[in-house]
Amino acid sequence: MARYIGPKCKLSRREGTDLFLKSGVRALESKCNIEAAPGIHGQRRGRQSDYGTQLREKQKVRRIYGVLERQFRGYYQAAASKKGATGENLLQLLECRLDNVVYRMGFGSTRSESRQLVSHKAISVNGKTVNIPSYQVRPGDVVAVREKSSNQLRIVQALELCAQRGRVEWVDVDSAKKSGVFKNVPARGDLSADINENLIVELYSK
């Protein structure tokens, strides 16, 4: 499956919630009617079956983290093989992706932009360049913007935006040095309550 490159607003409207695919400079509601599904019949949201509800939740999470279907299934299988709650394991694996950590640290204004920074070799982990967005960051890893990329305007603007909205507690960032430490894997209670990972587990358990 190819990566979606169309309007980000359309994806948020499809899921009926803000997927944080935009930078957040303006409120999403000012430019995107997320209460209505995309298309000419968007005002009509029909009743969903249990399967439909489970599928929509899976699509929502997959789109939030920018993961393709095959990758997402792989994450689920890895989560199911680990000890603990499969749904929580799944979210933690997604949170440990390098592109997501770059976003959480504020070096990219969106996960999509953060993924591009990683792919373009603008990011290092423990002093070594890593250009794999799916790279799993571990507690204690130092993630930084490489010196040759540190003056990019989009990175400077992303850090300013992050300072306004605040950072998550599981990263410690020195904005001046454009470097941060991934302190720990977030617990389920630290992550979005708007995600019902149990629906995803039910979907893949069929």
Curated annotation (Swiss-Prot):
One of its GO terms (molecular function) is structural constituent of ribosome. The keyword Glycoprotein does not apply. PROSITE patterns: RIBOSOMAL_S4, S4. It comes from the Bacteria. Gene3D superfamilies: Ribosomal Protein S4 Delta 41, Chain A, domain 1, RNA-binding S4 domain. Keywords: Ribonucleoprotein, Ribosomal protein, RNA-binding, rRNA-binding. SMART domains: Ribosomal_S4, S4. Transmembrane segments: none annotated. The keyword Ribonucleoprotein applies. Pfam families: Ribosomal_S4, S4. Residues 96-156 form the S4 RNA-binding domain. GO terms for biological process: ribosomal small subunit biogenesis; translation. One of its GO terms (cellular component) is small ribosomal subunit. Part of the 30S ribosomal subunit. Contacts protein S5. The interaction surface between S4 and S5 is involved in control of translational fidelity. Belongs to the universal ribosomal protein uS4 family. One of the primary rRNA binding proteins, it binds directly to 16S rRNA where it nucleates assembly of the body of the 30S subunit. This is Small ribosomal subunit protein uS4. It comes from Pseudomonas putida (strain W619).
